[in-house]
Structure formats: C-alpha cells, structure tokens
Amino acid sequence: MTKYSTELKIEIVSKYLNHEDSIKGLAKQYNIHWTLIRRWVDKAKCQGLAALSVKHTKTTYSSDFKLNVVRYYLTHSIGVSKVAAKFNISDSQVYNWAKKFNEEGYAGLLPKQKGRPRKVPKKSKKTTKKLELSEKQKYEEKILKQEAELERLRVENLVLKKVAARYPRYPTNKKHN
C-alpha cells in the first residue's frame, strides 16, 4: 500500500501543469512536502502522467540497465531526481547505484545472492571427470606399452624355466650350505 494514490498524484500534477496553483501552494493545500510534488512533476514532464501510477510488483533491474543509469547520471550535469524521472525509478535507487559504482565499480552493480546461507551444504552428486581426447589417448598408449612389457616378461620367464629344466646343474631354488 502506498501513501499517495495514483489519482491524487495525477490531480496535483495536473493542477500545477495547468497553472492553477504553485508547488508551494499545492503542498500547503494537500499537506504534502513540496519536494515530493516537484519529483512527481518532473516525472510527469519526462514520461507523462502514466509514470505516476503505483507499481505493485518488485522490479529487478539488470546490471546493464543500472550501468546505463549511472553513466547518464555521471555524464550529464543534472540531479538525481531528474535522472530518476527520466528512467522512471526512485531517487534513492539512482543514488545507491551511483554510490556502489563509485565504491566497487561495475561489480557493485551485479546482482548479489540474497537470503541466509544454508547450514548444511547441498550434497553434490559424484561427477566423473571427462578426460580430454589427448589425455585419453595418452592413457591408452601407456596401457599398450605396459601390456607389451608384460608379454615380454612372460616370454623371458618361460625361457628361463625351460633353460632351468634342461640344465639341472644350475640350481635355482636350493640354499647354499
């Protein structure tokens, strides 16, 4: 619920634009601060009376939009309220974005993760690391080399067994006294 309805805003701004009363006179008549009426008038001049309508949904702005608003504010020598009226956003929003941009740069305009962090981290599924083709080929080549070495050692072992069987005078398993 907003403090001032759309109809009231349009009525006050229309009276000012039709030169029926001054901003200070309207402020006294409706018991509203004159700077607020000035913002409504600026917004209506830039974007029409439709810009005074009350928004009931929370708008999330992209970081590019924020950057455009801040750049416009910094390059043009006009106030926060005029920039806010031009882009149909609140004055405080322009001020906060400009402040964050000056302190943190573009990173300050990026969306932040909101809410309380989880106490227990999410259990992640085990992911198998996919090997690149070059790594896979290296492992296959290594396996082939090891298999060839194993076959060579088997043949050598077989030859040694046959030599030991043919020439028994060279004992292989007997202990020396």
UniProtKB/Swiss-Prot annotation:
Query: Could you confirm whether the keyword Kinase appears in this record?
Result: no
GO BP term (any one): DNA transposition
Coiled-coil ranges per the record?
A: none
The biased composition feature labelled Basic residues covers: 113-128
Q: What molecular function does GO assign, one term?
A: transposase activity
Where is the region Disordered?
112-131
In terms of Gene3D superfamilies, this protein maps to:
Winged helix-like DNA-binding domain superfamily/Winged helix DNA-binding domain
Keyword entries, A-Z: Transposable element
Q: Does the keyword Cell cycle apply?
A: no
Q: Which family does it belong to?
A: Belongs to the IS150/IS1296 orfA family.
Question: PANTHER family annotated for this entry?
Answer: INSERTION ELEMENT IS150 PROTEIN INSJ
Its protein name is Insertion element IS1223 uncharacterized 20.7 kDa protein
Organism of this sequence? Lactobacillus johnsonii
